């Protein structure tokens, strides 16, 4: 896919039953150039719209020369966060050694699906919803008690608003 305003090709895949999250994480931390991919803990995502808002902001920041991180893939993780703390966003939205559901985002083309030992699933809102941890999302975005965990649309609106407004005062 592409956003109409930008030339970069964007590929997104959903993986379940991932067996090598620890290896992927180690490769990311070591700076292996083959791993220039945003690997996201799928349990922290609410919908495709939620992720695409962060991807759009990351690509927009890249085009404007205003990225806060080293590359556009880490910028996606940073943009998912609702605050200006890069490490906090990487920790909250990135994968851990025991992550079993991963969404991978590759911006700019290139192979990445062979890096993940898991089952590739369709990237759909239904697939995302199967594993979303609403309580975790509410905690990550520090949503007030007035936001109902039962109202997924309300949580999604609040989360997307937080990531879009990050950095504005």
Swiss-Prot record:
Top-level taxonomic group: Eukaryota
Transmembrane segments: none
InterPro entries named in the record: CGI121/TPRKB (IPR013926), CGI121/TPRKB_sf (IPR036504)
SUPFAM superfamilies (UniProt xref): PF0523-like
The entry's keywords: Activator, Chromosome, Nucleus, Telomere, Transcription, Transcription regulation, tRNA processing
GO cellular component terms attached to this protein's record: chromosome, telomeric region; cytosol; EKC/KEOPS complex; nucleus
Location in or out of the cell: Nucleus; Chromosome, Telomere
One of the protein's GO biological processes: tRNA threonylcarbamoyladenosine modification
Entry-linked NCBIfam families: PRK14886.1-1
Assembly with partners or alone: Component of the EKC/KEOPS complex composed of at least BUD32, CGI121, GON7, KAE1 and PCC1; the whole complex dimerizes.
Family classification: Belongs to the CGI121/TPRKB family.
Name of the protein: EKC/KEOPS complex subunit CGI121
Gene that produces this protein: CGI121
